[in-house]
C-alpha cells in the first residue's frame, strides 16, 4: 500500500491521526448501515416472493372464475356490464426514509360516496350472476396487495442500489484509505524518532 505524499512533521502526524479517527468512525457507521440495510432487504425479498406467489395464485383463480361466469352470460350483456365503470380510487405516494434511503409508500382510497350513490359494482346485480359479482369483488380486493407488491419491489430496487454504494464505500475505507493512513502515520513516527535520535546524538557530541 503506497503511503501518502506528505512531509514527516508533527503537524502532519496530528492531522493524519485525526483523519484516521474520522475514517475509522465512518467505516463503522457505514458497516452498521450496510448490515441493517441487508437485514431489511432480506426481509423485503422474502415478503416480495410470498406476496407475488399469493397474487399470482389469486389472479389465476379469479381469471378462471371470471371465464366460467362469463360463459354463462350473453357476450353483449357482459360488454354492457363493464361499459361504464363507477369504481374510483385515489392514489397518492408518500416518501419514507429508511437508513437514508427514500422509499415510496403507496396509499389508496376508494370513492365511497360515488359507490354508495351508484352501487358497489359497475352494473346491477339483476343484470349479472352471483359468480360474476364474486369475481369482481375478489379482483377489487387484490388492489391493495398489488400496490404493496409494487411498493416492496421498488423499495428492494432502491435498497439494492444503496447497499452496493455503501459496500463500495466500506471497502474503499477498509482496504485503501485506512491502511494508507496507518502506513503513513507509521512512516512519519519512524522519521520523527530518527530525527529525535539524530538530534540527541548531536547534543551529546556537543556537550562531550
Swiss-Prot record:
GO MF annotations, alphabetized: ATP binding; proton-transporting ATP synthase activity, rotational mechanism; proton-transporting ATPase activity, rotational mechanism
The organism's place on the tree of life at top rank: Bacteria
GO biological process terms, semicolon-separated: proton motive force-driven plasma membrane ATP synthesis
Stored InterPro entries: V_ATPase_D (IPR002699)
Keywords: ATP synthesis, Hydrogen ion transport, Ion transport, Transport
Biological role: Produces ATP from ADP in the presence of a proton gradient across the membrane.
Cited HAMAP family: ATP_synth_D_arch
The family this protein is said to belong to: Belongs to the V-ATPase D subunit family.
Name of the protein this chain belongs to: V-type ATP synthase subunit D
Organism per entry: Streptococcus pyogenes serotype M49 (strain NZ131)
Gene field: atpD
